[in-house]
């Protein structure tokens, strides 16, 4: 079994969608996933996708600012790092961009969204 918290390991996948209920229906019926909703306070609801008891990904309503940029719904990977802030600095020093600065989410960890010099977007996370 892979240690998802190990530096450099893909650790999470997250769907940003314009239709949470439609996506829920699609993925539960196609893949047999179950879902569990959790409140994010002012940010709305976050849906966890599960296979049995194992959490395999998450889903949330696409933020308005992302939708206004014309982005289609998409899956985004998260890669585990030992230090989010140091990794963000390294991304910038190597020609990448920070799209969402480091932030903390209680019970989740510290994370940021970055873009490599070629334009590929991914999240980095230090799990709680």
Explain the meaning of each model-derived region.
Residues 1-24, 74-77, 125-128:
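N-terminal beta-strand motif that seeds the catalytic metal site of vicinal oxygen chelate
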Residues 2, 33-37, 66, 89, ...:
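Intrinsically disordered, low-complexity segments enriched in polar/charged residues with Gly/Pro
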Residues 7, 14-54, 93:
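Core segments of cupin and vicinal oxygen chelate
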Residues 11, 36, 57, 75, ...:
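A short, local hydrophobic-aromatic micro-motif
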Residues 12, 45-46, 76, 111, ...:
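Conserved beta-strand and immediately adjacent loop positions that scaffold enzyme active sites
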Residues 19-21, 50-55, 77-118:
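Vicinal oxygen chelate
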Residues 23-25, 59, 69, 87-89, ...:
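Short acidic, gly/pro-rich beta-turn/loop elements at beta-sheet edges
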Residues 33-72, 121-126:
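Conserved short beta-strand elements that form part of the metal-binding/catalytic scaffold
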